Amino acid sequence: MSIYHYWGKSRRGETDGGDDYHLLCWHSLDVAAVGYWMVINNIYFIDHYLKKLGIQDKEQAAQFFAWILCWHDIGKFAHSFQQLYRHEALNIFNEPTRHYEKIAHTTLGYMLWNSWLSECPELFPPSSLSVRKSKRVMALWMPVTTGHHGRPPEAIQELDHFRQQDKDAARDFLLRIKALFPLITLPEAWDEDEGIDQFQQLSWFISAAVVLADWTGSASRYFPRTAEKMPVDTYWQQALAKAQTAITLFPSAANVSAFTGIETLFPFIQHPTPLQQKALELDINVDGAQLFILEDVTGAGKTEAALILAHRLMAAGKAQGLYFGLPTMATANAMFERMANTWLALYQPDSRPSLILAHSARRLMDRFNQSIWSVTLSGTEEPDEAQPYSQGCAAWFADSNKKALLAEVGVGTLDQAMMAVMPFKHNNLRLLGLSNKILLADEIHACDAWMSRILEGLIERQASNGNATILLSATLSQQQRDKRVAAFSRGVRRSVQAPLLGHDDYPWLTQVTQTELISQRVDTRKEVERCVDIGWLHSEEACLERIGEAVEKGNCIAWIRNSVDDAIRIYRQLQLSKVVVTENLLLFHSRFAFYDRQRIESQTLNLFGKQSGAQRAGKVIIATQVIEQSLDIDCDEMISDLAPVDLLIQRAGRLQRHIRDRNGLVKKSGQDERETPVLRILAPEWDDAPRENWLSSAMRNSAYVYPDHGRMWLTQRILREQGTIRMPQSARLLIESVYGEDVNMPVGFAKTEQLQEGKFYCDRAFAGQMLLNFAPGYCAEISDSLPEKMSTRLAEESVTLWLAKIVDSVVTPYASGEHAWEMSVLRVRQSWWNKHKDEFEKLDGEPLRKWCAQQHQDKDFATVIVVTDFAACGYSANEGLIGMMGE
């Protein structure tokens, strides 16, 4: 059967783009041509990786990569694939449809190699290796090229998807194109242990380059569909010309600027903080991977210190870019705003770097959308010089989270990087994005057992690839630090141990290289030393009284509650009590639609933010954990439900955060003129010998949110003993007194402690099973399983809800403005929804079917809540999603 009877791409509803179909042989050469130019231009370091594998000549490397790409779609020669599209000029026209087991063409291609093409040595490149050894080397490359859809091909037994004429056509095609690449060879080193190890390490990056070549070579705007028959060498020359234009789709690599001092990035810093000074002085000129752990208080300039380190490493040729991973989308948005004023200084003025915001809701952030500039067919369009930061993010990066990490500078959730070491689809693209890049991870003390284990896997992988990692934290426990250092040492295959630190060893900087560990104290400035007194309240009535007293004095006050329901209930009580007028009262929690959440965030910053002035007087905010990390708020007074000590330290950081005068106006320097800051904690009455129900009997919802009741009791004990949170002096003491391995737990919590300890080790073990096995390279053996539902976080499943209004019988989004449907979304816990779903009017029947068709949602899973202006609908702009609560 002729190679010209097999299609590779069809029109699929496109009105332009060439003929009805694109011959498989031409599509294969399109992708090969893209790969050729990727090597010539060293796009995403593909030439560098091939040099590491021993192909030093660039032309030879380009020909080899192009040749191996010709194999990527050999699975499409299968009859099972070809019958998916019919055309009178193709080989299956008028043939009856046959039933085949549904198998991806990527796996079919790998199967064709294993069962047929591997026995055709005439297809192999010339080599001094024997046929048997050449076959073994080729077997290494086959998963890399055939597994081009984000996952390695499965190793399955031969099936009947290929007729003999299909196998012959595939062989004929590969034989014809071999002559196009006269320089290809199989180096002897690829069959030696060291060469195989090197290949397995680099196969992840090369497989990602294969994906990029396939995506680009599949674009009909560059490669119009062609059904015409012609000699392969004729089409190859055409493909090379088209591909030279197509690769302009890839934004060119930016050139790193020289590091000339702190003013390069931060011209406003006149006097570096002690931590920033350490970042300027550290010896970074060592070979291989490095790990830095920066532990310091809020206000010590950790972010700036980390970026100073990153720029120094980049300027020394140890990285081309960085990715800044944060715990939440809100903190990522805030960091994106901060980076927008700094990142261009990392590169030379004539460069065109990209700054990407990488998380699932980035399209809802206006500043990110404004920063996107497109790369056109010619590749000559430059960013609009009138845009906020002269350059921005190439649209090529922005159209998919899969490609987001490929931008020079990324800011997003840590989850986006963690997905690189888990069996998510296209994890190889994420790994390629992290290669030659510094990973910065902020607030890592907040990681639970599951996330910590995944983070350790990421640190290990970064180290094994020779990359630097910078970890930022308020305070780490000894156990947390030990595990991070151990992960790095596994990556560099060295034995390195973190030193045992005492309670006075804080702030602290740790630097780990392949040969040594440097651990040193960091000085503290007087300005960031804080002393917050602790007060205790044992009833909600006492808390409400305290709020009334604060309002009477003209102070602004926050009460951070552990559960949404508790927050809503207290908000309503305050409204009824008239302690505070409604316009001075704000409620903020996680069960608001994005539209309302953004509005409330803005209100919160306006009333409680750094620049707030007279308008803050007498204001009250009832909030949940959503304000712990992302918002720079500054309250005169604060109440908090009892929470684990690290969270209380974080919450206390929002209490009298900035220096103000007695009227609440910000001062540039001097002493704060307000009353001594006191964090008042709502907690059960103290009990030296608590029973198992110590917390649940007094604070039922808090007991559910924080099930490790022993740690809650330990938190109350150490804060009662100390009476203050003194930073940085008592930071290590507070953390180790709650999370240390040698703490004594009361007998009443023995059962709870056993359950929590079991959960801790179970979560870590389960997370460990989710990590990829990188040792065999990019192949089917990388993971024992590919669970349908994977997550970077071990939390209860959530449900996505859309809010809609019915206006003149038309379903319209709750939110107004741009991205209205996305802004009308909120997510709730599955268990909460199961309990309350019957309390809402939901779209169903034909209206739901139409809505799903318009919004490209699955009607079996989509839930659209109909809301009105009446509270009975279960949602309000002031209270969020409440259902029938309180009715």
What does each of the following model-derived ranges do?
Residues 340-408, 414-418:
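A substrate-engagement module of RecA-like helicase motors
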Residues 432-438, 445-520:
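Post-DEXD/H (motif II) to motif III coupling segment of the RecA-like Helicase ATP-binding lobe
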